[in-house]
Amino acid sequence: MKNKVSLRRMLWLLCLPLLLTACKDSMDEHYEVPDWVADNAWEVLSSGEHGNYSIFLQGLEIAGYKQMLEGKAILTIIAPDDDAFQTYLNKRGFTSISDMPVNEVSKLIGYHVLYYSYNKEKLVNFRPTGSTETEEEQNIKAGLYYKHRTRSSDAPTVETTPTGASVMVYHLERYLPIFSYRYFQTKGIDAKNNYEAFYPNSTWTGDDGFNVSNASVKEYGIIANNGYIHAVDRVVEPLETIYTELKNKEKYSTFLDLYDSFGVYVADDELSKSYAKAYGVDTLYQYQHGGLPNIACEWPTSSYLNFTALTALSYSIFAPEAALFRGFFSRRFH
């Protein structure tokens, strides 16, 4: 009897590896990614099936975005091909993207990497409240929620307050304008004439879709397993705040000096909780202008959840040149 029991145990032990191997093969087969599932965004761009993107891919790697495209994030990619990127590099005087300062590469490439996953339809008429709206509701302000959050931002800067204190100002990520035909339909204005007035070196090609800032779309909605890719005909240059644009032009210095007389550094609790420790400070600040539009802030609100404001609100400033101010002050006070 003892011998029979021992023999059974030996048989079980001999069969166990076969059973485990069979189970492992079955599990591997069960969890294997089906052939019909799309590749990740990095693989799609690397495949050559939709064009050559070697310079853009090199930039993504330099800027530290490769893992995101490989599946670490859900995103939308605005992808300039090699011809578009070489044109941009030539214009900037660079032989290769590796010749650019890393912070510039990060700022530029990050402007082509959007948070969240948007196909063509969602970018034509983005709805900040989600996709549960009725058809009638979707026609309300159609196309006017046109700005989308990117990974492009400037590093925090240390500024001096009027009292002489040093504060760290945090710069939020840039938003990218995407102009769809619905945007112009809702406003009741001609798309081509108005778009090309603001982008005189670009061509409106969005009659059935959209233009991405200064770029035309060559191919919409290339599918990846972690988002969508929209191929464009040129590199999209990061837009600056109105404040930065004015600051970089001497002829608006008087206007900016007057505007800055209302300037105040405001502590931001939410930003401080999220990011202050990473920069070795207790508090992060935003530079605002009292009751005037906060043209130095990248966002109209620091809450990333306020999609309605973030995707729609923008400012227009009528800024007289310094010579006009001099003439005004001369007439007014002499």
Each predicted region: which residue ranges?
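Mature, structured domains of secreted/extracytosolic soluble proteins
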Residues: C23-H334
